[in-house]
Amino acid sequence: MKEKRLYVAYGSNLNLYQMKFRCPTAKLIGTGIVKDHELQFKGRSDCAFATIAPSEGGAVPVAVWELKESDEKSLDRYEGFPSHYFKQEIPVEMNNGKTISGMVYIMNLRQSFGVPSKGYVQTVSEGYRNCRLDMSVLKDAIRQSVSRYADLISDRLINSIGFEQISLFDFDTADVDLDEDSSEADEDEYFDFLGEDEEITDSFIPTQ
């Protein structure tokens, strides 16, 4: 009979209800941190999932589960192993002061940063509450991942356009109709369209 295995959860599998459904015989051992790592959200642009990556000085709060062989096989299916996530052993500093080694799922490195769905964030945040973990780590991870995703999209857009510098001497002002009254009218129409009290926001972070 195969020995039981310790599994390190940092995302949606912190959620006690979800784990009870996925792995009915799994047993929660305790909580701790994975040092020198950070929590990230990667995958599809509008449906990213949690993963962890090396980051000097970082710390990811985790829960440690004891799995039977049937539990691990079930998680392999849910986590998309080995195509979406791979496994490795990782040290965990438990809250009781002990250091253990457990199996963790890590997303394949080809994936880019993305935005997690509202439902997924709710599942993970409930897990954080279940295990009494530091919610600020989750919030910071969402902000950082969304910011990196936005930077990635901006870079792709800029590189695809290929901006060219144009000299003022390339224009013949004689061919340009400079109608000051028309310009002012167009400007007034533009600001009337926006409205004085209109507030423009640009936030990708899902609300909880």
Where do the PLM segments sit?
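Glycine-aromatic micro-motifs
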Residues: 1-207
